Design a protein with these regions (language model features):
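Short amphipathic alpha-helix with an adjacent loop that forms part of the alpha/beta core around
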Residues: 1-2, 74
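Catalytic core of membrane glycerolipid acyltransferases/transacylases, capturing the structured
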Residues: 3-64
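Non-catalytic C-terminal accessory region of glycerolipid acyltransferases
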Residues: 66-284
Length: 284
């Protein structure tokens, strides 16, 4: 993680605390803070919203993303670290999903590198469809920082490069994790490709698309009841063209903060291998 200068920090997304874990390497390496791009709905929350603004995260309106895009570019050029979840939503398969192009476009426009952060174990603390494992439960969360990736001006090609790098880094990190803690056949938090009971990437994509369409229908029904024009998918895509990737194009992350490790100390406990960290589950 660079100790100075701006960088996009794409983080793989498997759990609800990823925004905390994803900021740990930067904090440990120069006490830098990562400002995450987060969906407007989080800022609208009466509890989370004020905290997000105080921590100077970037609000993303997924139907009008231009303002957030320009703000992110401004901060990157000023030397900030901007975090993003390029998969847009939590990956139920715990594999790397298709990435949105926003990360590459932001990095290219700002003239900064993409520095991927890969983690494994966060889904064991709290993820979609499963109970929280909070408190001093000693769940190991491994975090690894990848090599900086320069952009070329071709957002599609750069996004593929980023995807391939993140997928390879995640694969190796999981093997190292299993080597340390052993196999977990049938475990909900283990990918199907490694013998777990998580859905495959294809199965997870079907589930996500179904839920996405249900959300659109629910939102449009509410708009119609209020006498307003439904937005549908078309206007969602129009919004993407105006300044982002539309629905979750900049990710759906939350705020960045300081995690408390399982031993009660701030931050994380260093683990073997350069660029690795191990985080305990946060205290509540």
């Amino acid at each position: 993680m660079p100790v100075d200068g701006g960088a996009m920090v794409p983080v793989n997304h498997t759990g609800y605390f990823d925004f905390v874990y994803g900021g740990i390497p930067a904090f440990l390496n120069g006490r830098r803070l990562v400002r995450f791009m987060a969906k407007k709905e989080i800022f609208d929350n009466k509890i989370a919203g004020p905290l997000m603004r105080k921590m100077k995260h970037i609000e993303v309106d997924r139907f009008a993303g231009r303002g957030a895009y320009e703000e992110a570019v401004r901060r990157l050029r000023a030397g900030a670290l901007v975090g993003i979840f390029p998969e847009a939503t939590i990956s139920r398969s715990f594999e790397i999903k298709e990435l949105k192009t926003g990360t590459a476009r932001l990095a290219d426009d700002a003239g900064v590198p993409m520095v991927p952060v890969i983690m494994f174990g966060s889904q064991r603390v709290w993820t979609k469809g499963h109970k929280k494992q909070l408190g001093r439960v000693n769940v190991p969360v491994w975090i690894r920082v990848g090599e900086p990736i320069a952009t070329t001006g071709d957002a599609a090609a750069d996004t593929k490069t980023l995807h391939d790098a993140m997928a390879e880094q995640l694969h190796q990190l999981r093997l190292d994790y299993i080597d340390r803690y052993g196999d977990a056949p049938g475990a909900y938090w283990m990918p199907a490709s490694l013998g777990g009971s998580a859905p495959t990437l294809e199965e997870a994509n079907v589930m996500d698309e179904k839920l996405r369409l249900e959300r659109i229908a629910k939102r449009d029904a509410k708009l119609i009841a209020e006498g307003k024009e439904p937005l549908g998918d078309t206007k969602l895509n129009d919004a993407a063209a105006r300044g982002g990737d539309g629905d979750g194009g900049f990710g759906d992350g939350g705020g960045n903060g300081r995690a408390k490790g399982a031993n009660g100390s701030d931050g994380t406990t260093g683990d073997s291998g350069a660029g690795d960290s191990t985080a305990g589950s946060p205290e509540r």
